[in-house]
Every structure is written in structure tokens, then in C-alpha cells.
Amino acid sequence: MSENHDAIVTDAKTEEAGGCPVAHGRAPHPTQGGGNRQWWPERLNLKILAKNPAVANPLGDGFDYAEAFGSLDLPAVKRDIAEVLTTSQDWWPADFGHYGPLMIRMAWHSAGTYRISDGRGGAGAGQQRFAPLNSWPDNGNLDKARRLLWPVKKKYGQSLSWADLLILTGNVALEQMGFETFGFAGGRADVWEAEEDVYWGPETTWLDDRRYSGDRELENPLGAVQMGLIYVNPEGPNGNPDPIAAARDIRETFGRMAMNDEETVALIAGGHTFGKTHGAGPADHVGDDPEAASMEEQGLGWRNSFGTGKGGDAITSGLEVTWTSTPTRWSNGFFKNLFEFEYELEQSPAGANQWVAKDAPEIVPDAHDPSKKHRPKMLTTDLSLRYDPIYEPISRRFYENPEEFADAFARAWYKLTHRDMGPKSLYLGPEVPEETLLWQDPLPEADGEPVDAEDVATLKTKLLESGLSVSQLVSTAWASASTFRGSDKRGGANGARIRLEPQRGWEVNEPDELAQVLRVLEGIQQEFNSGTKKVSLADLIVLGGTAAVEKAAKEAGFQVQVPFTAGRVDATEEHTDAESFEALEPVADGFRNYLGKGNRLPAEYLLLDRANLLTLSAPEMTVLVGGLRVLGANYQKSPLGAFTRTPGSLTNDFFVNLLDLGVTWKSTSEDQTTFEGRDAATGEVKWAGSRADLVFGSNSELRALAEVYASDDAKEKFVHDFVDAWVKVMNLDRFDLV
């Protein structure tokens, strides 16, 4: 516990015996956290399915950020930001008289938490303002950068989100220092609470690294080497100043952010063209991070007792390195100094490992004393760009071709800062580049006259008469649409990339079965498209699921019309980055009762994680699982969770039979992943289930939802709720409908 909590809080929590109240057996008040999670730390956290609720948004349901952003005079905003950058404040003086390098670091660290494996992190919601990111060691003193920007945020209010402002400021900083950026897109709407659904690692101590196993194998989905770092330790692995070993960490962590070797070199060299690091004194002079700091600090942290605590006495990383002789101007100086000098190891004033140019002139300016000069210095991770056999030729080519380097950095910076925004159609503002890039998962424009209601009815009939079963149609539509990730707005049914590699070969999609279904659907498409109108395979896949759900509802005794909106298009192989899409392959899909190999978490947690990526609520997750089970959507037609005698009929049987008091459940596997339900009276085996099934009876909150759908009066409600949740998933990537 922090030693700097306010006295009034400390008094309220501390027992007469003194010390930490938790250590002395006292549970925290609900306002302090804890609660049920303290008693049962491994219980499912369903709150991640109710994040950013409307009641927490002070702007109200009617606020349209895209419209508000569109009202901005963006050049005027940029002029105001530029004025901040060049107006040094006594309370936090600007290095070299310019806040540009600080703001580049702020923007980079806002975006740099993105990881491609689950799409989480990134700049899209301005999470750098909240814990834990606001207090990560690697984000030291970025609280000051954001505070410097408050006058700009205050002036433009809700028309400019913090999330957009952080990235825009990074761009303005680059432009003010002579660099031509690739472009900027707004559209990052703020949220109002810290993310609780991101796994940042197993460690409970800053800068610990329990995330490795075997031959330095980094745990998935993590994208940094230590808790509280954005990427790598700049001193080298665990502080070991070995540039070759550091290069391995760089390649791993930047790769997990979807950056290749050229982009990695460009980003590191481009970013380190500007500014300096800060390590004027020992780390024990630095106080608590912003989240732990006392109330009078008003959200600022890392108060420094060394000297003046700022300017030339600042302490952030503990390293004291300035890379170039022009730290506030774009140049090729980083590569010049990297290749033209030899470096020897030294320790910073804080005791950190860094490198200084041997026998070099003092050509680097001091950040705050114009009478001083210094020799060029480098980080261990900078030297990786010279000594790693893959990075070195890239670095040398960039050194010899400055224009190529500038273009590579501009593009890599744009990718870094826009990677989690979703398709280009969501980009806002006058500075959005015309060029569409492969990492944006581009889709073609719709071709031909769209289908109408009569066409849809005709196609439904053809689909249901095609010989494909309800199970096949539902499973294919689900497989296509459920790739969507709300974290970075990738995936989904639009584009029909399920017919392309790598998706058509994913184990969870049962490639042989999928190929059979796609052949039938493509035949229907070709026949229809021989006329004057066109239907995309993407639309046809979803329509097949739609027709199947309607048929299944009718079998259950309910006539429903499942909403369907045409307009999807088919992506091309040329515009599909297969390697990038490999990250979307599910390691588990509890909705299909699929559990891949090597998962660390039990199936019920993975189901919850999948539901979270699909932006589902707990009721939506519940009703979808119950419906998909009776519709036969299980992986390889597994009997697990198929608690019905009428498969293909959209009944609430899953819930009725799961909650049947006449059934007792026993594990059938040593790892307790599968179970059988026996008739309590006869001992006859009635059902088989997985953890992703039985959790709806064992977890008290999910059981409460299951009871709703198992009730005698819930049959029709179940059908309508399933349809609503189904349509939501089918349309998750239909940003054109919002």
C-alpha cells in the first residue's frame, strides 16, 4: 500500500494495532475496491462486459463526437498547440526551449501499447490518462505533458477528445521541428473510466518480468518485456547492456505491434532524432506515481527532490542521453552519430547503463545551459540498430538515403498512431491521406445494383433449398462475423475474408466443411449475379445464417423476421495482409465450444474474453451461447452443451436442461474440462458439457441470467433476444449503418 495516502483515508482504514488494514485482517471498504474479488479472486469478472456504460458518460447519449470534431478549425487548433510547444513554463521547463520531443514521446507511448494479438492497447480511447498507464514507469513525467496541453483541451472542449489531442500534438511537434508527416485522422472518442479488460502481465511489481518462459519466450498477448514498459528495457534485457540480445527483444515487441524490421528501425531512429532522456540523479529522489500520489498533487506524480526537481535536474528513465546535435530539428543526425563514432559503456548519474561516443567532440547542446556541450550518447537499444545483422543494413541504407528514411518514418509513425482506429471510413478531418494502406484492411467499393427485399426473399429460399443445413449456415455466418474485435475494429463479416487465407484454413473453421459450404454459396452467388443485380459473398454468408435462424425459430413455433441489411463487399487477396490476419485466429471460441491447445486460462474465462472482444453484454453472451448450442454450431458437431432433443430448433432447451434439478454433473476428465450430466434417479447419462456450458449454472450471476431464459414464460423472449444479439454480431463491422 502507498505510504502517501491522505491521512483521513489512512485513519479510516488502519486498525488500532496499526499498519496495513488488509494485513491485519480488515477488508477494504467497497469504495476502495476489493469486495467479492478479494474473497474469490478467480471468480469471473463479468464487469468487463459492461464497460463504459452510458450512465458514466457526462456528454449523454445524444453527443456525436464525429460531428463535434468536424466543427473544428484544425489549422487553428494546430497553431494553438504549436504555441504551447514553444512557450516554456517555469513549473516544468522545456528541454532546449521546445516541448516537441516530450510530446512525441507522449503520443508514441499513447499509441505504443497496441498489440496485434488481441487488438487491445493503443491510442484510440486516451487511456494514458487513467491507471495503470498514467503511472507506468515508462510513462514517467508524461503527466506534465498532458497538463501542459490543458489550455488547448479547455479551449476546444468536447470537440477535441483527449485521445485525438495526444496524437495530434505528436504530429504538430514533428511538423514544428521540420518534419513532414504522412497525415492525421481524428475520430478517437474519449472514454470515462480505466480499462479493466486488458491483461498487461502476471507481475505485481513494476519492472518485474515473470512473463518469460523457455528460451526467452514472451507470453502472449503481451507486447513489452517488463511490467510498466512500452516495449523494451533501453539498457538491454534486464539491464544487461548487450545490443545483440536487445535486438531480439526489439524485434519481438515491435513485431507484436505489427511492425516489420524496416518500420522498427525507422521508428526508433526517427523518434530518437529528437530530444533526450532524463537521469540527472538517483531514482530514490523520485516520489510516487500519479495514481499513488497524495491529493494535493492533483493528479501529478513523480515529484523529484533532486536539486530543483525539473529542467536539468529531471529524472525519468534514469538514463541521460541526447542523440543528436540538433535535438529540436529533423535531421539524419541519429544515423550519422550511430555510424561515425565508436561507443563505450558508461553509467548515467543515476547509475543506468548507457553509451558515450569515444574520442568525439562535444557537439551536443545541453538542454538547459547554453554554455555547455556534450558528446553524443546512445542507448543499448540504439546500438542494436548498428550491430544486429538484420537491422544494420536497413539502418545504413536509411543513413545513406535520407529521403527514404524520412518517408519510412512518416509512414511508420502514421501506422503507429492510427493502427487501432479501424477502417479508413472512420477517419475524420482534412488531413486524412488519400492513399489507402494494406494494414487498414481495405475493402472495394460496392459494384452493381444492390439487392432489394424481393431479391433477399428469393435468395433465402435458394439458401434453404441448397442442401445446406441450419447448422452449416449458422456456423459459417458465425465464423465469418465473429472474427470482429471491438478493441481495434478489425475483422467481421464484411469482406468475406473467411474464403481467403488464412481464415479458410483456421482449425476452428473446420476447413473441409467450410470449403463445402463456400462452394454451394458461391454457386448461388454466381447464378444470381448472372442477372442485372449483384450480391456479394459476404452478404450471402450472413443471409444464409439469417435464413437459418428464421427457420429454426419457426421450428420452435415462432414466426420472426431477422433484420438483414445488404451492402457488404468481398475483399480481394491482394488487399488482405494474410500475416496480419493470422492474429485474429481464435485460440478458443466458447460460442462454438472450441478450445485450442496450449491455453493458459480455462474455457469459461476465454468465453468471457471472446464476448468482450465482440462488445457483448452478459445477457447477449448468455442468449447467444444458448441459441448456438441448440442450432448445432459446435466445433466438429461436438455433443458438448447440446442440451436438446430437437437440434435445429431455436428453443430455450439449453437453459431448461442445464438447470434441471433432476440432473447431477460429474467431471469426465482429469483437467475438469468436460462433464457428463446423469439422471439423478436412474444414473443414465443425459448430457455432456464443457466448462463454457456449465458456467451458466455454476456462476451465480450467469445463473441468474440463465434462469430468465429457462423460465416457462421465456420461450418467445429467448427467440427475440437471440435474434437481436445475432444481428448485432452480424453487423459489428457495418460502420456504414451507425
Swiss-Prot record:
Q: Please write the reaction equations for the catalytic activity of this protein.
A: H2O2 + AH2 = A + 2 H2O; 2 H2O2 = O2 + 2 H2O
Q: Which UniProt keywords apply?
A: Heme, Hydrogen peroxide, Iron, Metal-binding, Oxidoreductase, Peroxidase
* Annotated Basic and acidic residues bias: 1-16
- Entry-linked PROSITE patterns: PEROXIDASE_1, PEROXIDASE_2, PEROXIDASE_4
Q: Disordered: where is this region?
A: 1-37
Share an example GO biological-process annotation for this protein. Answer: hydrogen peroxide catabolic process
Q: Which Pfam families match?
A: peroxidase
Instruction: Summarize subunit and interaction data from the UniProt record for this chain.
Output: Homodimer or homotetramer.
Name the UniProt record assigns to this protein: Catalase-peroxidase
Origin species? Streptomyces ambofaciens
Which gene name belongs to this protein? katG
